Amino acid sequence: MNLNKHLEFFNPLKIEEDIHIIGVGAIGSNLALMLTRLGCTNIHLYDFDKVESINVANQNYFERQVGFTKLEATIENMSEINPNIEIEAHPEGWKKEHIMSGFVFLCLDNIDTRREVVLKCKNNKYITAILDFRMGLSDAQHYMADNQDEKAINRLLDTMDFTHEEAKAALPVSACGTSLSVLPTIWTVISAGVANFINFCKTNKYKHTILVNPFESIVDAF
């Protein structure tokens, strides 16, 4: 894969750690392809779901992939970009028994499971950082924590002080009850999060919180 477009700015070959993407839906499927185009490899994917026709509008899948597992479709799309990419699939989804190291990208729908992942990673010296992505219809949030910084991890856990049911109740839905989401919101928060990841890899500095609303041209980071 020819990386000359960005190699002088970001060299993925310097990243020796594994990358774990937990959930390959709206956020995770698009994130996986962005990291692939950057040249990242040694990627672990976790998901147990299948591609449905409704997913094609906001997830990185195609109509011909309806019925595939999301892992099958994501791996196919990543391999089209970089045939030499190294991917490990976990079709059972994330389980507490999984042993992880490196970077953990949280792209799950369920806040309770997100919290479980962070608690499992806490105090694990082999986890470098945790990057969390959440979105509504027009706004989204990205949170990041250096896993060796206990204060940062506790700050991340503090943002998860609500239940999955409370989160669902706050999401806008269509007349038929489908959760609404659009690509401008998805791509904006992913771009912000991946830029945060790159900055951390290059300088060890990062933003703990990034809030975006592409429809009002708002990005706030601190």
Question: What are these model-predicted stretches?
Answer:
Residues 1-222:
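Adenine nucleotide-associated cytosolic modules
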